């Protein structure tokens, strides 16, 4: 799983026993793309390295995938900006760097297309986590 990335990063997966047999009706390619975008965000925003944990849980017909890192985290201002401006694509402000924010936009669109929700949380210097929640097939 860690092949092809710097030794400064470790990626771990934790699948809760109750999630092992949960079923999510989805486009696997798109869900993989969303997860990859979140992992790449952790790597990109933590050039000094970090630990990235992907965890999968299942409770009451909800499948929850969390991508968390112990990197630089998010300031309250950046967190608010991500919530208020889910992406910069719609902006006509030429001062904005359009390379930023598009990965999260794509993740949000993929999740919502699958009837799910996305929540970003983080604390400055304590890491960031993105929680994707989906209704699972019983």
Regions found by a protein language model. Name each.
Residues 42-43:
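Short helix-loop "hinge" at the ATP-lid/N-box region of the Bergerat-fold HATPase_c
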Residues 73-81:
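Short helix N-cap motif at coil->helix boundaries in the Bergerat
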Residues 23-26:
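Conserved micro-motifs of the catalytic ATP-binding
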Residues 3-15:
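Short conserved segments within the C-terminal catalytic ATPase subdomain
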Residues 69:
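Acidic ATP/Mg2+-coordinating residue in the GHKL
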Residues 103-107:
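Short alpha-helical Gxxx[C/S/T] motif in the catalytic ATP-binding
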């Amino acid at each position: 799983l860690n092949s092809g990335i710097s030794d400064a990063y470790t990626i771990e997966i934790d699948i809760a026993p109750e999630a092992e047999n949960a079923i999510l009706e989805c486009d696997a390619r798109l869900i993989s793309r969303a997860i990859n975008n979140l992992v790449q965000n952790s790597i990109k925003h933590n050039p000094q390295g970090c630990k990235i944990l992907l965890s999968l849980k299942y409770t009451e017909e909800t499948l929850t995938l969390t991508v968390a890192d112990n990197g630089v985290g998010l300031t309250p201002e950046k967190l608010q900006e991500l919530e208020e401006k889910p992406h910069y694509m719609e902006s006509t402000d030429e001062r904005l760097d359009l390379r930023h924010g598009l990965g999260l936009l794509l993740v949000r669109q993929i999740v919502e297309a699958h009837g799910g929700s996305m929540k970003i949380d983080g604390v400055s210097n304590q890491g960031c986590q993105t929680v994707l929640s989906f209704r699972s097939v019983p």
